[in-house]
């Protein structure tokens, strides 16, 4: 049994947490039923409140993806474009310079445009280079495209950060990827799913014949102003603590809260629950993905495609 000083430590640890929780509940008018379970839960609640300011739930619901569009968005989603230059990997290189884009994801959430209308399927007869170009340059559309590429090859064989990742491609034929840690240098044929932003980067880096297999378009606009204001507020909280001696822990916490605004957008709306049984056994919920998406859409206050475009904009920066 726990006794003496160890028991006293455990008791005071719990009492301290109880006092902290009581202080938080008094500050925010919460009860044990309403208090967020995590620190990012506060950000989620504030973001929900912001989205209620002139943004009707029906608007968000009207632009949420159906199941087929959702699957394409999942295929297109990827994170930052981080990669080691294959010509220098493993070497010690001196007299180099570097640059860092501060708060990249919050920056694009405030400054860039996103798909703000329902995704509409592109008719098969319009899946051609001229129509896609008009959508991008004249009609100012956000595009979600399943494409194939024949005779793919880097324009510059010395380029150190090839954009296409084997993990995000399918139906790959005769590809050279082993020389660059999973990035594709060339291929006889492959298929992938991209946004219009990714398409621009691919066309800048590679040559090859692009075949448009399937696509959707949406209209570009800025994110809702109340949501942008919420991002700015958390960014201000973070920057006021940056470099302040003795505030390092609070700075890291403020930074995590700021980044969680992006995390809410990029969270997969289709999540299977794990059901724990007796004796350590567990089962995975077998509810169909389409049904889970429908349930998620009914309570969503942010659109999943916004998260997909946040990282796409950042990769293009």
Regions found by a protein language model. Give the residues of each.
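Conserved acidic
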Residues: 1-317
